Design a protein with these regions (language model features):
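Predominantly flavin-linked oxidoreductase catalytic cores and closely associated redox partners
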Residues: 1-134
Length: 136
């Protein structure tokens, strides 16, 4: 930006842009470099829970027309997870008789034998979910 090693202005110096706004939203993704700097500079994590991560799976199903309701959105929480593990699902009925079916589980689960993929498979056995995707 036109500064030498000591921070003095060189011949090609041009000042940086000044940004003035009532609200500024930084959305660079999960744990981005700018976000880390802002959190540190403004102490944004003081007294806050740390960021949490999860693993998710998504499948696209073409289902029977009688089970399809274009535009329907469903979200669930919990089952088949135990009470100490958080997670949930989404089911989006898209066009063309398609359903986007997904499940997300927080990566802080305590059970070392828990398989997020297997939990997603088990989720699809719930009677309400099985009814939607049956024959798909």
């Amino acid at each position: 930006m036109g500064l030498d090693k000591e921070g003095n202005k060189k011949d090609g110096y041009e000042p940086g842009m000044e940004l003035h706004a009532k609200v500024t939203v930084f959305s660079e993704g999960c744990r981005g470099h700018l976000g880390k700097q802002l959190i540190k500079k403004f102490d944004l994590d003081n007294g806050k829970d740390p960021q949490q991560y999860g693993i998710g799976f998504k499948e696209i199903w073409k289902i029977d027309e009688k089970n399809h309701q274009e535009g329907l959105v469903m979200h669930t929480a919990g089952w088949p997870l135990d009470k100490n593990t958080y997670g949930g699902s989404f089911i989006y009925h898209a066009d063309n008789k398609q359903v986007f079916l997904g499940y997300v589980i927080g990566l802080d689960y305590k059970n070392p034998h828990l398989s997020p993929f297997d939990e997603f498979q088990r989720f699809k056995t719930h009677p309400a979910i099985r009814k939607i995707i049956e024959g798909g």
